[in-house]
Amino acid sequence: MKYILLCMCLLSLLGCGTDTKTQQDTKPTTTANEQAKIDQGQDAHVMVAKQALSSGDYAKAIEEATASIKDNPNNADAYSVRGFATALSGDTTKGLADTKKAYDLAPNNVANYYNMAMVYKLQGQLNESKQWFEKVLEKDPSNTWSVYGIATIYADQGDDTKSLDWLEKAINIDPSVKAVAAEQDHFERFHNNTRFKTLVGL
């Protein structure tokens, strides 16, 4: 359940990164029309992969991202989506390798920063995860789900005050966070906490 909610959060981030796709086909015989068809095909695979990831169909997301990578081995978006989907499927080591590859290809892709944070979080590397959420916030200070991600990390680390401070920031950006926080296991132990109950409306 919590992974489905995380994917819903991802849906809000899918378009926040810089488009960093570059075509490195150096064949002199490729016309502009042929190149446009190639680019559209790659975009189609990544779009389907992102939709599949958002709906929780990780196998389809991996399949489509892999097809995009086959067409263009330098497609950072495809590596990022495949990495996150792979991690959510249970292979966090392989998922981290793909998100790191995406970062190497496109170090300014903010959407990949979020995916990197989530993969580290799935591995239990909370400090590294928090650093990547903070990188998202450097570029996009009102990124709700990165603020929320930091709140969950502090909750998991047992720092109740910081957790609730960050949760309050997330709710102030987007009140829909209340419903997510009320249901996620990160905050289960807070259900008798007066401040938490006030924040989420329990």
Please identify what each model-predicted range represents.
Residues 38-77, 81-84, 88:
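Alpha-helical segment of the N-proximal tetratricopeptide repeat
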Residues 81, 115, 149, 183-184:
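Canonical tetratricopeptide repeat
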Residues 20-36, 172-202:
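Terminal, low-structured helical/coil segments at or just beyond the last alpha-helical repeat
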Residues 13-15:
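C-terminal motif of bacterial Sec signal peptides marking the signal peptidase cleavage site
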Residues 55-64, 88-101, 123-135, 158-166, ...:
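Structural signature of tandem alpha-helical TPR/SEL1-like repeats
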Residues 71, 104-105, 139, 173:
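Structural marker of alpha-solenoid helical repeat scaffolds
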